[in-house]
Amino acid sequence: MMNAKALYKKKALRDRRKLRIKSKLLGDALRPRVSVFRSNRYFYAQAIDDVKQSTITHIDGRKMGFKNTQEDAKKLGALFAEELKKAGIERAVYDRNGYLYHGVVAAFAESLRENGIAL
């Protein structure tokens, strides 16, 4: 189990990565930013138009009954790719939100690519 100081440092490092990544990414209506969030139990994603500061579409793994596993992330990626195509989006910018590109974050991105979304 981690103590409070270690948890604080872990979150601070993730926040620094998040700012470093987000400063280089910008999404618009034609190529939105796909931002992901993973909790210990669930996985979420949304497509964001940074120019209008609005969410184009989103997917909620908790409401759909998917857990935070690689298999479920692949299924969510396929469903999210369909939602993006319905909105007329073929290209996107992937924002891993400070998480390492590994595990469910990588599986979700690969699933988007396999289903026709250029990242």
Swiss-Prot record:
<comment type="similarity">
    <text>Belongs to the universal ribosomal protein uL18 family.</text>
</comment>
<dbReference type="InterPro" id="IPR005484">
    <property type="entry name" value="Ribosomal_uL18_bac/euk"/>
</dbReference>
<dbReference type="GO" id="GO:0006412">
    <property type="term" value="P:translation"/>
</dbReference>
<keyword id="KW-0687">Ribonucleoprotein</keyword>
<dbReference type="GO" id="GO:0008097">
    <property type="term" value="F:5S rRNA binding"/>
</dbReference>
<keyword id="KW-0699">rRNA-binding</keyword>
<keyword id="KW-0689">Ribosomal protein</keyword>
<dbReference type="GO" id="GO:0022625">
    <property type="term" value="C:cytosolic large ribosomal subunit"/>
</dbReference>
<dbReference type="InterPro" id="IPR004389">
    <property type="entry name" value="Ribosomal_uL18_bac-type"/>
</dbReference>
<comment type="subunit">
    <text>Part of the 50S ribosomal subunit; part of the 5S rRNA/L5/L18/L25 subcomplex. Contacts the 5S and 23S rRNAs.</text>
</comment>
<protein>
    <recommendedName>
        <fullName>Large ribosomal subunit protein uL18</fullName>
    </recommendedName>
</protein>
<dbReference type="Pfam" id="PF00861">
    <property type="entry name" value="Ribosomal_L18p"/>
</dbReference>
<comment type="function">
    <text>This is one of the proteins that bind and probably mediate the attachment of the 5S RNA into the large ribosomal subunit, where it forms part of the central protuberance.</text>
</comment>
<dbReference type="GO" id="GO:0003735">
    <property type="term" value="F:structural constituent of ribosome"/>
</dbReference>
<keyword id="KW-0694">RNA-binding</keyword>
